[in-house]
UniProtKB/Swiss-Prot annotation:
Keywords: Mitochondrion, Ribonucleoprotein, Ribosomal protein. Its main location: mitochondrion. Putative component of the large subunit of mitochondrial ribosome. The keyword Mitochondrion applies. This is Putative large ribosomal subunit protein YmL35. One of its GO terms (cellular component) is ribosome. It comes from the Eukaryota. The keyword Cytoplasm does not apply. It is found in: Mitochondrion.
Length: 17
C-alpha cells in the first residue's frame, strides 16, 4: 500500500496517505 504506486489485492491503497 503505497499511496497510488502500489496496488495489490492483499495491500489496499490509501490515496493520499
Amino acid at each position: 500500500g503505497n499511496a497510488t504506486s502500489e496496488r495489490l489485492p492483499t495491500d489496499p491503497v490509501y490515496p493520499x496517505v
